[in-house]
């Protein structure tokens, strides 16, 4: 025997309803199901206070929800068997830690679906939010099995920390698809944002559309045809230890990335040249700030610098200082020609100057993502100088 749940009215306060699980309802009568407890805010209330609940003659362990439950969280959390069909939009953390069974949504879903799931199938016949199949905040191991199918578009950080399983996106994906991926497979039939596969060490990502930018830590390996499209395989992310990640992108839709630009073909606008900014902590930086002091001349010398490829350094006129600008902020940095930097990218040590340039929306499991940020780079004028850490804190409010 299955059950049908219909919301009695709009939800004024979000509900936490992990009790909506086929195995929890098996063998229960209607009165027992109506008395199951859910959280409205921090107050426990009976499920029957919010839903009309009726029996249905459909298959056993089937729950059908008819209506908008976009403010209901944790539906199918930890689910092991059975099926849930939702005809409407759904809230956060659908099917998190799911181990088996099937969830199908005829609508859109919010973020964090399939968090750390181990098995089962989630099918979304609409769009999904951010962090699909991702890890919890503070954790690094995401989805460990199962399958997530999204027929529409999905947001940022898809498959973050993914260990195993499959994610299929029929539309577009946002930024950092497959970030810190350790296994499994992600397929995106449409376009994707910037930096797919950032910090991945294993697994497969296939993007059949256009990507905004490719991190320099990916090495081109081979070209082949798949489903009539010419695809290129990249290995990476080479910024990680012993990486075995496989990133496939569509050749014809990514000529802006694949065709090597020459000095003659690059244009310097009023803002400068467009490059990809990456950041990371350095050994010397760690030695300097041991003890917490970031206000020394040594700290400025190490962190207020911009490493530039020889080609871009020459294109800019071999400057002493450069201005790097991003999302309305800009910093002046000492220019350093570095043969180890790929043309079209720059490296800035992770410090207060880098924080000014790193947009907050690049977050990944709680921290901003200091890789793959599009910025502009130009030669500094005579009156533009490098600001101290104190001056940057005063001007931009970035933390020490």
Swiss-Prot record:
A GO molecular function held by the record: formylmethanofuran dehydrogenase activity
Keyword annotations: Methanogenesis, Oxidoreductase, Repeat
Metabolic or biological pathway, per its Swiss-Prot or TrEMBL entry: One-carbon metabolism; methanogenesis from CO(2); 5,10-methenyl-5,6,7,8-tetrahydromethanopterin from CO(2): step 1/3
Catalytic activity: N-formylmethanofuran + 2 oxidized [2Fe-2S]-[ferredoxin] + H2O = methanofuran + 2 reduced [2Fe-2S]-[ferredoxin] + CO2 + H(+)
UniProt keyword rRNA-binding, yes or no: no
Induction details: By growth on molybdenum, under anaerobic conditions.
Pfam families noted in UniProt: Molydop_binding
Name of protein: Molybdenum-containing formylmethanofuran dehydrogenase 1 subunit C
Species the sequence originates in: Methanothermobacter wolfeii
């Amino acid at each position: 025997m299955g059950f049908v749940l219909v919301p009695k009215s709009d939800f004024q306060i979000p509900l936490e309803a992990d009790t909506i699980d086929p195995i929890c309802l098996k063998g229960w009568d209607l009165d027992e199901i109506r008395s199951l407890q859910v959280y409205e805010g921090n107050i426990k209330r009976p499920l029957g206070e919010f839903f009309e609940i009726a029996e249905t003659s459909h298959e056993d362990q089937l729950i059908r929800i008819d209506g908008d439950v976009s403010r209901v969280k944790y539906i199918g959390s930890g689910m092991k068997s059975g099926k849930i069909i939702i005809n409407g939009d759904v809230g956060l953390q659908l099917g998190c830690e799911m181990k088996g069974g099937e969830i199908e949504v005829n609508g859109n879903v919010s973020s964090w679906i399939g968090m750390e799931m181990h098995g089962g199938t989630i099918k979304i016949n609409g769009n999904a939010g951010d962090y699909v199949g991702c890890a919890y905040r503070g954790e690094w191991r995401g989805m460990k099995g199962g399958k997530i199918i999204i027929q529409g578009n999905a947001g940022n950080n898809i498959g973050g920390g993914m260990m195993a399983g499959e994610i299929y996106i029929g539309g577009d994906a946002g930024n950092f698809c497959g970030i810190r991926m350790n296994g499994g497979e992600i397929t995106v039939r449409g376009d994707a944002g910037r930096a797919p596969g950032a910090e991945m060490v294993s697994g497969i990502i296939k993007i059949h559309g256009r990507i905004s930018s490719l991190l320099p830590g990916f090495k081109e390996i081979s070209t082949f045809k798949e489903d009539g499209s010419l695809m290129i395989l990249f290995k990476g992310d080479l910024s990680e230890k012993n990486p075995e990640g496989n990133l496939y992108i569509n050749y014809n839709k990514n000529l802006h990335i694949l065709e090597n630009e020459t000095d003659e073909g690059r244009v310097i606008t009023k803002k400068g040249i467009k490059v990809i900014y990456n950041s990371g902590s350095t050994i010397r930086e760690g030695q300097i700030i041991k003890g917490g002091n970031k206000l020394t001349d040594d700290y400025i010398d190490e962190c207020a610098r911009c490493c530039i490829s020889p080609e871009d350094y020459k294109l800019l006129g071999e400057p002493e200082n450069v201005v790097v600008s991003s999302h309305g902020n800009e910093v002046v940095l000492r220019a350093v020609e570095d043969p180890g930097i790929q043309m079209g990218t720059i490296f800035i040590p992770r410090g207060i100057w880098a924080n000014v340039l790193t947009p907050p929306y690049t977050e990944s499991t709680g921290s901003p993502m200091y890789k793959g940020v599009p910025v502009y780079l130009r030669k500094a004028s005579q009156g533009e100088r490098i600001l101290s850490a104190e001056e940057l804190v005063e001007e931009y409010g970035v933390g020490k």
